[in-house]
Curated annotation (Swiss-Prot):
Superkingdom, taxonomy of origin: Archaea
Binding positions (substrate): 226, 363
Species annotation: Haloferax volcanii (strain ATCC 29605 / DSM 3757 / JCM 8879 / NBRC 14742 / NCIMB 2012 / VKM B-1768 / DS2) (Halobacterium volcanii)
Protein name as catalogued: Homoserine O-acetyltransferase
Keyword tags: Acyltransferase, Amino-acid biosynthesis, Cytoplasm, Methionine biosynthesis, Transferase
Pathway: Amino-acid biosynthesis; L-methionine biosynthesis via de novo pathway; O-acetyl-L-homoserine from L-homoserine: step 1/1
Entry GO terms, CC: cytoplasm
Domain AB hydrolase-1 intervals: 47-369
Location(s), subcellular: Cytoplasm
Record has Acyltransferase as a keyword: yes
EC number(s) on file: 2.3.1.31
Pfam families from the UniProt entry: Abhydrolase_1 (PF00561)
Gene for this chain: metXA
Protein family according to the UniProt entry: Belongs to the AB hydrolase superfamily. MetX family.
Gene Ontology MF: a single term: homoserine O-acetyltransferase activity
Length: 415
């Protein structure tokens, strides 16, 4: 059932819509794909902004004004960027965020009910980023939204945004890709593979059939997968600053995972305590099968698939593009964003590659709104000519290929 809440400066619509029969890229067909979304602000026919969430995110991108003291997924994942008076201002824009197929926050996925009344489990069709984009397009059709003023995405949500420029190039005026890339590199592919094996090696995973109150969930495997993710999202400098080699009180969480008998002789360190805490909290809110499905979709995405190059894939896009990367992000590097910027430039797409100096790793796009907000706000409002938007090729040309890539760093304050 649709829920609409209106408070001063906030109009929020939250719903799950049955968009009907949906054929996945795999060829499998779901007779009734359900899609969960939240929408903020008022639609005037030209001001729609689609925000694409990250790997384990949800449609809950912005706050409802009643979130004091809440944590986890109950708290908006980008509430410092999206909302009334924020960088993506819901007083000006109609902002939609859609939970992607394969996830577990209301959209159909492995944990949702199948035709037999039981959870799908691993019988749910494989999903791809292309499936996400097409489901979003159908949901927007249901809402009466045609051309989008902007599509904005961070991390794998940035891949989702890029896919919009390929599948529906005429439907997007401005494209903002934050902390993302045209594809994963082999190191990230390897880490994702180990994370999935942590889940499938948990005896409680049981081939993906673990649903029901009487059955234990593969929380240990899912927790280990999440711990790998957190190591991936932080930078070496930020981890050293946050934890160092300091010891922590073992407490209850020190026994969250089996350990060898000698472990009691050695210190239980703060970094271990942090990872155990994150594992515990993640297992409370996420589904292990969904993690398998969504990491597969991310691993599979390749912008140039079916084309000769990234530039060829983007050739039909005639809007403007902003790429935001972070110097401390080794998950999606500034070099990967610069390569992507080159693909846009070769297609004569107005593009800016805005590099932010940060040592917060991949998480910078979530934890440094004071640096992310200004370029996003100005780009959504004004395009690449926005005052706070910088570029690695300030003259609008291509960086000198004979020289090492040297990004133009930015330290930004409020608008």
């Amino acid at each position: 059932m649709s829920r609409t809440r209106t408070t001063p400066g906030r109009r929020v619509e939250s719903d799950v819509v049955d968009i009907g029969e949906h054929e996945f890229e795999s060829g499998e067909i779901l007779p009734d794909l359900k899609v969960a979304y939240e929408a903020y602000g008022e639609f005037d026919g030209q001001n729609a902004v689609l925000v694409c969430h990250g790997l384990t995110g949800s449609q809950h991108v912005a706050g409802h004004g009643t979130e004091s003291g809440v944590s986890g997924q109950a708290r908006a994942w980008w509430g410092d960027i999206v909302g009334p008076g924020k960088a993506i201002d819901t007083n000006d824009y109609y902002v939609i965020c859609v939970n992607v197929p394969g996830s577990c926050y209301g959209t159909s996925g492995p944990a949702s009910e199948g035709p037999d009344g039981e959870p799908w489990g691993t019988d749910f069709p494989p999903v791809t980023v292309h499936d996400w984009t097409r489901a979003q397009r159908r949901l927007l059709d249901h809402l009466g939204v045609g051309r989008l003023h902007a599509v904005v995405g961070g991390s794998v949500g940035g891949m989702n945004a890029l896919d919009w420029a390929v599948q529906f190039p005429d439907d997007v005026e401005r494209l903002a890709v934050v902390a993302s890339a045209a594809r994963l590199d082999s190191q990230c592919l390897g880490i994702d593979a180990v994370a999935r094996r942590a889940i499938t090696s948990d005896p409680n995973w049981n081939g993906g059939d673990y649903y029901g109150e009487e059955r234990p969930s593969p929380d240990a495997g899912l927790g280990l997968a999440r711990q790998l993710g957190h190591l991936m999202y932080l930078s070496k400098d930020s981890m050293e600053r946050k934890f160092g080699r300091r010891s922590a009180g073992r407490g209850e969480r020190g026994d969250a995972f089996p350990s060898d008998p000698a472990a009691s002789f050695f210190p239980y360190r703060e970094v271990e305590s942090y990872l155990d805490y994150q594992a515990e909290k993640f297992a409370e809110r996420f589904d292990a099968n969904a993690y398998l499905y969504l990491t597969r979709a991310m691993d599979d995405f390749d912008l140039s698939e079916g084309y000769e190059s990234d530039a060829a894939a983007l050739a039909a896009f005639e809007g403007e593009a902003l790429l935001v990367s972070f110097t401390g992000d080794w998950h999606f590097t500034t070099e990967q964003s610069e390569s992507l910027a080159g693909a846009f430039r070769r297609g004569d797409v107005p593009v800016a590659h805005h590099v932010v100096e940060s040592d917060h790793g991949h998480d910078a796009f979530l934890v440094e709104p004071e640096k992310v907000g200004p370029p996003l706000a100005d780009f959504v409002d004004e395009g690449v000519a926005g005052r706070a938007v910088t570029d690695t090729a300030p003259d609008g040309g291509e960086p000198d290929e004979d020289e090492d890539f040297a990004p133009v760093h930015s330290s930004l304050f409020s608008r």
